[in-house]
C-alpha cells in the first residue's frame, strides 16, 4: 500500500458542523472535534465527501479514476455499492492562528498535538520524525509559525481551541428579522494534517460504450487499471477544495498540500 501525508490549509473561515451535539448556551452550530481530546478536526467522512464533490464537479478526473478512489453508492441506476480504493483519515488540527501585536496573527500548536500526529503516521508505516514535521509546518506557515515561540503549553493551546476563544459568528436573516443562529468557525490560516492510504493501482469495471447495444439492452464492460498516486496527486495537490458548510458565502475553501508520499 502507498501512503501520503497532506496538509489542509484553510484559506477562508471554516465551519464543518458537528451534527451529533445539541446546542447549549450561545452556540447553535458547533464545529467537529476529536472525540477524545476535544481539539477541532475534520472527520474523515466529511473530508471524503468534500474531496469527492470536488473531484466530481471541479476536477478534470475521469469517471473510472473517481470510482477507483471514492467508490460509488447504490442509486441512480447503480445496482450495488462499489468500494473505493482510498482510505481517508480524520484531518487533525496542527496549527491554529491567534492574534498577534506584531504580525496581525501567528500560528500556534503544542507538542502533544504534534506527537500524536507523528505517532499515527508511525503506526501506519510512515517514518516522519517530529523535527521534519515542525520544519514542514514552518514552511506551510509562511512566516507566521515560529518553531521557537509557536509551540506553546498544551493547556494554553486547549484554551485557544475552546468554545470561549474560537470565533462565533451570527448568521442574520436576509429579510432583516434578526439573527437566525450563532455558529462556531475555525479562522482562516488554520492548518490540518491528514493521511491517505491506497494501493499502487486499482482495477475498475465500467461500461464499454463502444461495444454496448442500447437497442437490445446488451451492455458490455471493460476493466481499467488506475494509477492511484497519479490520479490523487493530479486532482488534489496544490488545489483549493471547499469543505463544510456555507460555500455560497465563502466558507471552507482550503488548499491541499502533499507533504510526503511513501
Write out the residue ranges for each language-model feature.
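RNA-binding basic/glycine-rich loop and surface signature characteristic of RAMP-family CRISPR effectors
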Residues: 1-262
Amino acid at each position: 500500500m502507498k501512503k501520503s501525508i497532506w496538509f489542509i490549509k484553510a484559506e477562508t473561515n471554516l465551519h464543518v458542523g458537528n451534527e451529533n451535539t445539541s446546542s447549549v448556551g450561545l452556540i447553535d452550530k458547533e464545529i467537529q472535534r476529536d472525540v477524545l481530546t476535544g481539539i477541532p478536526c475534520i472527520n474523515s467522512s466529511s473530508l471524503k465527501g468534500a474531496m469527492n464533490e470536488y473531484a466530481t464537479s471541479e476536477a478534470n478526473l475521469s469517471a473510472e479514476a473517481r470510482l477507483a478512489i471514492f467508490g460509488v453508492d447504490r442509486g441512480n441506476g447503480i445496482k450495488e455499492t462499489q468500494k473505493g480504493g482510498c482510505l481517508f483519515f480524520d484531518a487533525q488540527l496542527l496549527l491554529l492562528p491567534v492574534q498577534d501585536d506584531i504580525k496581525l496573527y501567528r500560528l500556534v500548536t503544542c507538542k502533544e498535538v504534534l506527537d500524536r500526529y507523528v505517532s499515527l503516521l508511525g503506526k501506519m508505516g510512515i517514518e516522519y520524525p517530529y523535527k521534519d514535521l515542525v520544519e514542514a509546518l514552518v514552511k506551510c506557515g509562511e512566516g507566521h509559525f515560529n518553531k521557537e515561540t509557536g509551540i506553546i503549553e498544551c493547556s494554553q493551546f486547549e484554551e485557544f481551541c475552546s468554545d470561549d476563544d474560537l470565533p462565533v459568528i451570527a448568521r442574520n436573516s436576509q429579510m432583516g428579522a434578526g439573527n437566525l443562529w450563532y455558529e462556531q468557525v475555525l479562522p482562516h490560516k488554520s492548518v490540518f494534517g491528514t493521511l491517505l492510504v491506497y494501493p499502487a493501482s486499482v482495477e475498475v469495471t465500467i461500461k464499454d460504450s463502444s461495444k454496448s447495444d442500447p437497442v437490445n439492452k446488451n451492455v458490455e464492460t471493460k476493466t481499467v487499471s488506475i494509477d492511484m498516486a497519479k490520479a490523487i496527486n493530479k486532482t488534489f495537490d496544490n488545489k483549493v477544495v471547499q469543505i463544510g458548510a456555507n460555500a455560497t458565502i465563502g466558507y471552507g475553501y482550503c488548499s491541499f498540500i502533499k507533504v510526503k508520499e511513501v
